[in-house]
Amino acid sequence: MAKKALITGVTGQDGSYLAEFLMNKGYDVHGTIRRSSVDYRERIAHLEGKPNFHLHYADMGDSMSIMQVVAKVRPDEIYNLAAQSHVQVSFDAPEFTADVDAVGVLRVLEAVRLCGLADTCRIYQASTSELYGKVEEVPQNELTPFH
């Protein structure tokens, strides 16, 4: 039986590349997309319609939608790539950014726990090099100071 991966943020650059990579390795890939009046699925258009690619509506700000997807898919792996990723927006709307980027992680973890998958589901939490600010060394590592 194929492994099942759930990718939040599947329509982003990294999410679309990861979906294709995992599908080529034989995974059954499930991705989350937000309901929106704008169609932002151009990066995954070539994957849609393939038998091992599935889309689900969910929002990182809505714990129930995340819970429903995790309960339905019961993934072996979750790659949490969904985020409010615009630096300026993080300053203009800090509460929204924290809700999506920080509390959203908690929502994913709680969904895994409440669905009884804590011992079987592996989770990858993505982040950004923007956390470091103006860096003096490349690449960054766990000892790189924040500026």
Language-model features and meaning:
Residues M1-H147:
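N-terminal Rossmann-like NAD(P)+-binding domain of SDR-like oxidoreductases, especially those catalyzing
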